[in-house]
Protein backbone atom coordinates (compact mmCIF):
# COMPACT_ATOMS: atom_id res chain seq x y z
CA UNK A 1 0.00 0.00 0.00
CA UNK A 2 3.04 2.23 -0.28
CA UNK A 3 4.12 4.22 -3.30
CA UNK A 4 7.34 3.79 -5.30
CA UNK A 5 7.64 0.04 -4.83
CA UNK A 6 10.20 -1.89 -6.81
CA UNK A 7 9.37 -5.39 -7.98
CA UNK A 8 11.60 -8.33 -8.58
CA UNK A 9 11.00 -9.95 -11.95
CA UNK A 10 8.20 -12.47 -12.35
CA UNK A 11 10.79 -15.14 -13.21
CA UNK A 12 12.81 -14.43 -10.07
CA UNK A 13 9.68 -14.72 -7.92
CA UNK A 14 8.63 -17.93 -9.66
CA UNK A 15 12.07 -19.36 -8.88
CA UNK A 16 11.72 -18.37 -5.21
CA UNK A 17 8.32 -20.07 -5.03
CA UNK A 18 9.65 -23.25 -6.65
CA UNK A 19 12.51 -23.37 -4.14
CA UNK A 20 10.08 -22.86 -1.25
CA UNK A 21 7.75 -25.57 -2.56
CA UNK A 22 10.66 -28.00 -2.96
CA UNK A 23 11.87 -27.27 0.59
CA UNK A 24 8.41 -27.69 2.12
CA UNK A 25 8.31 -30.65 4.50
CA UNK A 26 5.00 -30.15 6.31
CA UNK A 27 1.80 -30.51 4.25
CA UNK A 28 0.12 -28.00 6.59
CA UNK A 29 2.70 -25.31 5.76
CA UNK A 30 1.36 -22.94 3.11
CA UNK A 31 3.39 -21.14 0.50
CA UNK A 32 1.71 -17.74 0.19
CA UNK A 33 2.93 -15.73 -2.79
CA UNK A 34 2.48 -11.99 -2.53
CA UNK A 35 2.44 -9.71 -5.53
CA UNK A 36 2.61 -5.94 -5.40
CA UNK A 37 2.40 -5.69 -9.19
CA UNK A 38 -0.98 -3.94 -9.27
CA UNK A 39 0.29 -0.63 -7.93
CA UNK A 40 3.41 -0.77 -10.13
CA UNK A 41 2.44 -2.54 -13.36
CA UNK A 42 -1.36 -2.70 -13.28
CA UNK A 43 -3.99 -5.41 -13.11
CA UNK A 44 -3.02 -7.27 -16.31
CA UNK A 45 0.55 -7.85 -15.13
CA UNK A 46 -0.82 -8.81 -11.72
CA UNK A 47 -2.93 -11.51 -13.37
CA UNK A 48 0.15 -12.78 -15.23
CA UNK A 49 2.02 -13.04 -11.96
CA UNK A 50 -0.89 -14.73 -10.17
CA UNK A 51 -1.04 -17.44 -12.83
CA UNK A 52 2.74 -17.90 -12.86
CA UNK A 53 2.89 -18.15 -9.06
CA UNK A 54 0.12 -20.74 -9.04
CA UNK A 55 1.91 -22.73 -11.74
CA UNK A 56 5.07 -22.57 -9.62
CA UNK A 57 3.20 -24.26 -6.77
CA UNK A 58 2.02 -21.45 -4.49
CA UNK A 59 -0.78 -22.62 -2.19
CA UNK A 60 -2.26 -19.16 -1.84
CA UNK A 61 -1.94 -15.82 -3.58
CA UNK A 62 -1.74 -12.48 -1.78
CA UNK A 63 -2.55 -9.80 -4.36
CA UNK A 64 -1.60 -6.54 -2.67
CA UNK A 65 -3.30 -3.17 -3.16
CA UNK A 66 -6.43 -4.13 -5.08
CA UNK A 67 -8.27 -0.84 -5.35
CA UNK A 68 -11.92 -1.93 -5.33
CA UNK A 69 -14.35 -4.82 -5.62
CA UNK A 70 -13.84 -4.97 -9.39
CA UNK A 71 -10.10 -5.63 -9.04
CA UNK A 72 -10.64 -8.20 -6.28
CA UNK A 73 -13.17 -9.91 -8.55
CA UNK A 74 -10.86 -9.86 -11.60
CA UNK A 75 -8.16 -11.61 -9.60
CA UNK A 76 -10.63 -14.21 -8.31
CA UNK A 77 -11.81 -14.96 -11.85
CA UNK A 78 -8.23 -15.52 -12.97
CA UNK A 79 -6.94 -17.45 -9.97
CA UNK A 80 -7.38 -21.16 -9.30
CA UNK A 81 -6.11 -21.28 -5.74
CA UNK A 82 -6.83 -19.68 -2.38
CA UNK A 83 -6.69 -15.89 -2.13
CA UNK A 84 -5.72 -13.59 0.73
CA UNK A 85 -7.06 -10.04 1.08
CA UNK A 86 -5.18 -7.35 2.98
CA UNK A 87 -7.50 -4.87 4.68
CA UNK A 88 -5.13 -2.28 6.04
CA UNK A 89 -6.38 1.16 6.91
CA UNK A 90 -5.09 4.21 5.03
CA UNK A 91 -3.92 2.04 2.14
CA UNK A 92 -4.87 1.75 -1.51
CA UNK A 93 -7.62 -0.85 -1.11
CA UNK A 94 -11.20 0.02 -0.39
CA UNK A 95 -11.96 -1.51 3.01
CA UNK A 96 -14.36 -4.39 2.42
CA UNK A 97 -16.28 -6.43 4.96
CA UNK A 98 -15.65 -10.10 5.60
CA UNK A 99 -18.98 -10.86 3.91
CA UNK A 100 -18.03 -8.86 0.81
CA UNK A 101 -14.70 -10.66 0.58
CA UNK A 102 -16.34 -14.07 0.97
CA UNK A 103 -18.80 -13.13 -1.79
CA UNK A 104 -15.84 -12.13 -3.96
CA UNK A 105 -14.29 -15.56 -3.38
CA UNK A 106 -11.48 -14.64 -0.99
CA UNK A 107 -10.46 -17.22 1.58
CA UNK A 108 -8.48 -15.27 4.16
CA UNK A 109 -8.49 -11.66 5.26
CA UNK A 110 -5.78 -10.02 7.33
CA UNK A 111 -5.93 -6.80 9.32
CA UNK A 112 -2.18 -6.38 9.78
CA UNK A 113 -1.97 -3.11 11.70
CA UNK A 114 -5.53 -2.59 12.94
CA UNK A 115 -4.98 -3.63 16.55
CA UNK A 116 -1.71 -1.71 16.77
CA UNK A 117 -3.38 1.45 15.49
CA UNK A 118 -6.27 1.02 17.91
CA UNK A 119 -3.93 0.48 20.86
CA UNK A 120 -1.53 3.31 20.01
CA UNK A 121 -4.36 5.80 19.48
CA UNK A 122 -5.72 4.92 22.92
CA UNK A 123 -2.22 5.19 24.44
CA UNK A 124 -1.67 8.57 22.78
CA UNK A 125 -5.03 9.91 23.95
CA UNK A 126 -4.47 8.59 27.47
CA UNK A 127 -0.99 10.08 27.79
CA UNK A 128 -2.21 13.43 26.47
CA UNK A 129 -4.98 13.40 29.07
CA UNK A 130 -2.55 12.54 31.88
CA UNK A 131 -0.16 15.27 30.72
CA UNK A 132 -2.99 17.83 30.56
CA UNK A 133 -4.79 16.83 33.78
CA UNK A 134 -1.87 15.61 35.88
CA UNK A 135 -3.65 12.34 36.73
CA UNK A 136 -5.19 9.28 35.10
CA UNK A 137 -8.66 9.51 36.67
CA UNK A 138 -10.24 10.65 33.39
CA UNK A 139 -8.88 7.73 31.36
CA UNK A 140 -9.66 4.82 33.67
CA UNK A 141 -12.95 4.29 31.82
CA UNK A 142 -10.89 3.53 28.68
CA UNK A 143 -8.73 0.92 30.39
CA UNK A 144 -9.09 -2.82 30.50
CA UNK A 145 -9.93 -3.90 34.03
CA UNK A 146 -7.58 -6.06 36.04
CA UNK A 147 -10.26 -8.75 36.14
CA UNK A 148 -10.54 -8.83 32.35
CA UNK A 149 -6.75 -8.85 31.89
CA UNK A 150 -6.45 -11.83 34.22
CA UNK A 151 -9.23 -13.63 32.35
CA UNK A 152 -7.48 -13.09 29.03
CA UNK A 153 -4.08 -14.30 30.20
CA UNK A 154 -5.63 -17.09 32.31
CA UNK A 155 -3.79 -15.73 35.33
CA UNK A 156 -5.56 -18.00 37.84
CA UNK A 157 -4.64 -21.08 35.81
CA UNK A 158 -0.99 -20.04 35.70
CA UNK A 159 -0.88 -19.83 39.51
CA UNK A 160 -2.06 -23.42 39.81
CA UNK A 161 0.98 -24.67 37.90
CA UNK A 162 3.61 -22.81 39.90
Where in this protein do the model-derived segments appear?
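Alpha/beta enzyme core
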Residues: 1-81, 85, 94-104
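Flexible, active-site-adjacent loop/turn segments at secondary-structure boundaries
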Residues: 5-6, 138, 147
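Short N-terminal signal/transit or membrane-insertion segments
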Residues: 37-39, 43-47, 132-138, 155
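Catalytic-face loop-and-helix region of soluble metabolic enzyme cores
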Residues: 76-135
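Gly/Pro-rich interdomain helix-loop hinge
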Residues: 142, 147-157
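Conserved small/polar residues in nucleotide/adenosyl-binding loops
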Residues: 160-162
Amino acid sequence: HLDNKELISKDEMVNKIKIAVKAKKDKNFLIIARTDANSVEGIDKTIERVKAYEDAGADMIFPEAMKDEKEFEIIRKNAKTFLLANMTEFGKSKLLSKKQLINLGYNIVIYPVTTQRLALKNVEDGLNSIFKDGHQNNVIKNMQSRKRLYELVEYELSLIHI
